[in-house]
């Protein structure tokens, strides 16, 4: 075999090994990115659930406080508490 053919075979082998290595590493990186995406989605869902629970608590507190304090609406539709004074 000539030197040129030997170099061609070695070059093809090196190129093949490099391509297998490159594709393998690329798959690992993509798998990590997909896993990170799932973790971010789980975190977003957790935050959304916490915010929804906070909203529900705030709505319950508002109903409770409005039932305890007399509330009126003025001409602009704004809510105001009426001041009640106790005279002894």
Curated annotation (Swiss-Prot):
Keyword annotations of the record: Mitochondrion, Transit peptide
Cross-referenced Pfam families: PET117
Main localization of the protein described in the UniProt heading: mitochondrion
GO biological process annotation, one example: mitochondrial cytochrome c oxidase assembly
InterPro entries noted in UniProt: Pet117
Record carries keyword Plastid: no
Subcellular location field: Mitochondrion
One Gene Ontology CC term in the entry: extrinsic component of matrix side of mitochondrial inner membrane
Function text: Involved in the assembly of cytochrome c oxidase.
UniProt family annotation: Belongs to the PET117 family.
Name of the featured protein: Protein pet117, mitochondrial
Organism name: Schizosaccharomyces pombe (strain 972 / ATCC 24843) (Fission yeast)
Lineage: Eukaryota, Fungi, Dikarya, Ascomycota, Taphrinomycotina
Gene name of the encoded protein: pet117
């Amino acid at each position: 075999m000539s030197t040129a053919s030997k170099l061609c075979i070695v070059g093809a082998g090196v190129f093949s090994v490099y391509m297998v290595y490159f594709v393998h590493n690329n798959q690992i990186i993509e798998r990590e990115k997909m896993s990170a995406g799932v973790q971010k989605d789980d975190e977003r869902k957790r935050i959304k659930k916490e915010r929804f629970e906070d909203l529900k608590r705030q709505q319950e507190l508002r109903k409770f406080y409005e039932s305890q304090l007399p509330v009126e609406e003025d001409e602009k539709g704004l809510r105001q508490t009426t001041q009640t004074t106790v005279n002894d």
